[in-house]
Amino acid sequence: ATECTVHENYKAKILKANDLATVITGQITGHPVRVIKNKLANAFLAAEKEEGSKENPDMARFDQLGTGALQKSVKLGDVDNGSVMSGQIAGMVNKEESCSEIIEEIMAKFNELVK
């Protein structure tokens, strides 16, 4: 939404996403997160694959990768090295609208369906 305070690069990354743009990272930590694929997501997935095969995975590695990652993308606009959290629905978001426009569109479709 236009009222959303995330960095413009974050919004642009969501708008460019397609239906295959997201992956789940963090499963090894017990805190899975769906994110848009980028350098950080790829590094996280590679670390999970490597550490997941070990009897005693180096969990500090995930702390190092994740610390400050959301701030990088949300506040600083680094959508390559930051965590760009997004659901699978990102591929269906194709324009930025105000909250009121989004709600009006939802209600119009609802009213159309209940006739």
Residue ranges of model-derived segments:
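Conserved active-site-proximal phosphate/metal-binding subdomains
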Residues: 1-115
